[in-house]
Amino acid sequence: MFGGLVRPKSRGRIRLTGSNPLDPLQIEPHHLSHPNDLKAAIACVQLCREIGNSDALRPFTKREVMPGNLKGAALEDFIRDSVVTYHHQTCTAKMGCDSMSVVDGHLKVYGIANLRIADASIMPRVTTGNTMAPCVIIGERAGEILKADHKL
């Protein structure tokens, strides 16, 4: 059993390290940087323990493998040391009109002429499900926008 946060509040960032497009990116995931995320991760472990120790699953489980019998600060350390993400990386160039937005409602990048973005990076928040369906919608909408703009 594996529990995880579907809507983490922590936010990472990706930065350019130079002007050359081949320069490596600086990726700062900032997992668990928001205090609510650690609380939610602890709740995930507790829920997995309850389910795993339930009467329905007792015939199929011998013991908890990880994190074992950890509690308190030791459990928090385990969570911090073993945190992973299973989400597709999204929301790095969100659509909107606030100061953190990168593209407008027509997928145009603010301040850069003739550049649009049409992928999962424009989503303002991570979806609770797989990202494929929203990406299909974004692509379909991009096609409609381009056809209208170019009178096709």
Show where each model-derived region lies.
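FAD-dependent oxidoreductase catalytic-site/capping-region signature
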Residues: 1-134, 142-152
